[in-house]
């Protein structure tokens, strides 16, 4: 396989399988909300589900759109004609970025309501999960290539959030301006964690 074609196919695979893991994690939290034996467990799952929902909806629909665009590119000129159906898939995935809350609306929900309005509590709770995972694989040579960069991304996530929050106190437009990029960063960071966890298994 041509290296550039391999790059595109592996990107599609990353989004598809990582996205499935994200949806499973969200579904698991939903089950815990409904069946938790304690109020503390139910509340923690509900908070995590609320945090993950805009990431799952907006990041995965944007990733799906990117993946179908790559599909057109893999086919070359044939991807652009109706015979293969790729151009229809591009249209079908693009609408997912628009309905049930556009990417911009989901991004505002994540950054504005789920993160900044909680003074970063929901983000901290999730990044603690990631941090504990990174600590749990310390000393595992096979996991070092995944855990070290993941730990850096996890720390940077908190730093970026603080920087945006500080700027937003001076300029309210900052949240709207930064929200989509913040959501996409959050999506990549979340998928990085899930892929590292799958690599451990």
Feature map (PLM): residue ranges:
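Flavin-dependent oxidoreductase catalytic core characteristic
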Residues: 1-201
